Amino acid sequence: MNKLLTIALIFLSLSTFAQERIALVIGNSDYQVSALKNALNDAQDITKALEELDFRVTLVENADKRVMKDAIYEFSAKLNKDTVGLFYYAGHAVQYHGENYLIPIN
């Protein structure tokens, strides 16, 4: 988590003139198989840290596939050349044939 905050601070220092800072934070822990103990806590912690850095944060907790897709679509629709956007995900993910996939709770 400290590494992420360091990266975020560096990113922000490069974007001090951006008009708006928005973030999408997704925390998935309530999986039927192999639940994650800390993913939701991590998402909540990063949300608090980003809000202290003047980000307008959308926190999505324990999202199924539809909710994740909708949240990502809505987030991307808010981005423009004057916006600093940050995406953070805590939950299961896999890599398949060199592509990374985020795993919803269902």
Language-model region placement:
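Sec-dependent N-terminal signal peptides
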Residues: 4-16
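Extracellular/periplasmic catalytic domains that process cell-envelope and extracellular macromolecules
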Residues: 18-19, 78-82, 94-96
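Cleaved targeting-peptide boundary
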Residues: 19-25
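Glycine- and acidic-residue-enriched helix-capping/strand-helix junction motifs
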Residues: 30-44
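A short, glycine/acidic-enriched catalytic loop
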Residues: 38-41, 67, 92-106
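Functional beta-strand-loop-alpha-helix junction segments that form "active/interaction loops"
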Residues: 43, 47-83
